[in-house]
């Protein structure tokens, strides 16, 4: 049982409040409605307080006694008679101050560091102002919310990184990768529905268009073993155009060993597709020229080339 305060939830329409707290003076009793002190009331008796306006809604009504602590209630030195009733009143002031100190309701605040000596502060309300103490449940809820926000941000950033990686990969697989590239234009009209095409050329990269619309490598198509694999099946009649190519290491001349190797491989593939023209022998004594002449000789022997 509390001696210096009382708290009740009063319904809407309440105007009279019963005060069950002992006090020496009515001015020591303070009235709070939902945590806000009010002076809009009058005393109708020693134990009844009437609000100037009835409560509009259910309200927590708190009465707190705050006994005068700076001055003695009875001052014998000022001429108050030293009689039983005055001695009792003075001792009552001391008793009330002790009760208020123990119950803590009248303490206006602390002005120094507080040590709980390892004990907890319990039954706290959730914070409202920026400097209010926070409960564990409030912090846990905020932490969970922050975790959700971090997860969403991480997912968003990953999606952005993946998109950037795809765009970078597509850029690296075009013909501006910083090294010399050999490339071949190629196109076809699909005779039947398919999700892959094999141009018959050696290549490691491609700029691909479907019916004139550019495609993105790693998203709408991929290249595996000189074959273009599409993300979905293309219907018959689709026009597929591409610039096929591969990066090579630049040499000192106009053609590199690697570029002629790719040319030789592709020329051989084209020959067996009956699309090669008669090609004269190359001149010179270099390794590359010898390889090309050997290829031409084999094509003539097989009857693919007429001259």
Curated annotation (Swiss-Prot):
Q: Which UniProt keywords apply?
A: Viral tail protein, Virion
Pull one GO CC term from this UniProt entry. Answer: virus tail
Xref: InterPro entries? Phage_T7_tail_fibre-like_N
Compartments, as annotated in UniProt: Virion
What does this chain do?
Answer: Anchors indirectly the receptor binding (RBP) protein (depolymerase) to the virion.
The identity of this protein, by name, is Anchor protein
Recorded source organism is Klebsiella phage KP34 (Bacteriophage KP34)
* Source taxonomy: Viruses, Duplodnaviria, Heunggongvirae, Uroviricota, Caudoviricetes
């Amino acid at each position: 049982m509390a001696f210096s305060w009382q708290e009740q939830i009063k319904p809407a329409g309440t105007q009279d409040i019963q005060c069950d707290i002992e006090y020496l003076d009515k001015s020591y009793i303070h009235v709070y409605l939902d945590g806000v002190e009010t002076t809009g009331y009058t005393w109708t008796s020693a134990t009844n307080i009437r609000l100037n306006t009835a409560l509009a809604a259910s309200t927590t009504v708190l009465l707190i006694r705050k006994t005068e602590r700076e001055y003695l209630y009875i001052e014998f030195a000022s001429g108050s008679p030293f009689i039983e009733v005055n001695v009792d009143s003075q001792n009552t002031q001391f008793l009330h101050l002790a009760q208020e100190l123990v119950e803590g309701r009248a303490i206006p605040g602390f002005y120094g560091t507080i040590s709980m000596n390892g004990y907890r502060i319990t039954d706290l309300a959730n914070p409202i102002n920026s400097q209010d103490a926070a409960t564990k449940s409030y912090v846990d809820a905020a932490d969970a919310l922050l975790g959700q926000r971090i997860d969403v941000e991480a997912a968003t950033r990953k999606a952005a990184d993946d998109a950037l990686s795809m765009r970078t990969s597509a850029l690296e697989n075009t013909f501006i990768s910083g090294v010399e590239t050999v490339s071949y234009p190629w196109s076809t009209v699909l005779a039947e529905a398919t999700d892959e095409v094999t141009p018959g050329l050696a290549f490691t990269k491609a700029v691909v268009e479907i019916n004139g619309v550019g495609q993105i490598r790693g998203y709408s198509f991929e290249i595996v073993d000189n074959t273009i694999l599409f993300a979905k099946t293309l219907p018959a009649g689709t026009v597929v155009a591409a610039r096929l190519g591969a990066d090579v290491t630049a040499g000192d001349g106009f053609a590199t060993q690697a570029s002629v190797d790719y040319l030789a491989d592709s020329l051989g593939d084209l020959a067996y597709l009956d699309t090669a023209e008669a090609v004269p022998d190359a001149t010179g004594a270099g390794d590359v020229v010898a390889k090309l002449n050997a290829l031409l000789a084999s094509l003539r022997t097989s009857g693919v080339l007429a001259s």
